Amino acid sequence: SYMLALPDDEAQAPTITVGEANFGLYPMATGQSRLARRFYDEAPALDAVRAKAGLPLDADAAFAVGLVTSNPDDIDWADEVRIAMEERVSMSPDSLTGLEANLRFNGQENMITRIFGRLTAWQNWIFQRPNAVGDKGALKVYGKGDKAQFDWHRV
């Protein structure tokens, strides 16, 4: 996740505020809060975030406690976002479905995460799509040195 740092303009700098709802009011399919999942249930990391509850955190403060993974300033922002978008566009739209499912249903496994996180995305969606198994699909050209041709309109 990216958050813009504006060190020269604190009044305009975006902030993020964590509240009690972030600690379990809306559990994931794993039964964990999203913060617990993000920090792998590690108490020191969760305690550091809880200590900041109710405080507006700028990009540097949010990065320091692990709430964001990147905090580029306004000089680097456009390039960082462009690179992230180019990397994402280079992937098959169907593979992104699988990556999203892996992120949404990660962590402690149970029957719900197995069905909706793995089986549904991979068996019923990704491996049946032309982007994977078509003539120029990723699975057909894998290892041959050819570049897959993706149908971007199927997303």
Tell where the protein language model's regions lie, with residue ranges.
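C-terminal alpha-helix plus adjacent terminal tail
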Residues: A48-A64, T69-V155
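Crotonase-fold acyl-CoA enzyme core
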Residues: S1-V89
